[in-house]
Amino acid sequence: EAIDAHRRAIQLDDQSFVARWALGGALTMSGRFEEAVSVLETAARMSERHVLALVGLAIVFGRWGKRSEASALHRELMDRASRGYVSATHLALTAEAADQHEEAMAFARRAWDERDPAFILWGRHFPPYRALHSDPRFAAILREMDSPGVHS
């Protein structure tokens, strides 16, 4: 159903980066990795390699077991972060996709410490974070997120 809705959004606006990014995510979560890569590569091209497109590609490659491709995307974002801002939330996701668990945990901690809105939104329920949920350090972050007065 989500895939059909995103395809319809692309039909309505074939220049929509967001519609392609969302379709790529839906295809990834459905296990349709080849299609997801194709859609997300198009999104990356049309957006001049927007961070979200690269994160989406890293996630699909990680889920597909193509760790070297995920690692290359993580390195690209790390290089970009050395020259400008890339959120710790996005770096945590690409590190985990590249099977760099310790680095992913460090970025997740930094994302929470910085109160990165994307982490607050995605940290608990976004499927690519599930691999981190079993780590006691990530569980501690989630408990901190639930602490009274944290969001006031």
Which sequence ranges carry the predicted segments?
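Alpha-helical protein-protein interaction modules
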Residues: 1-152
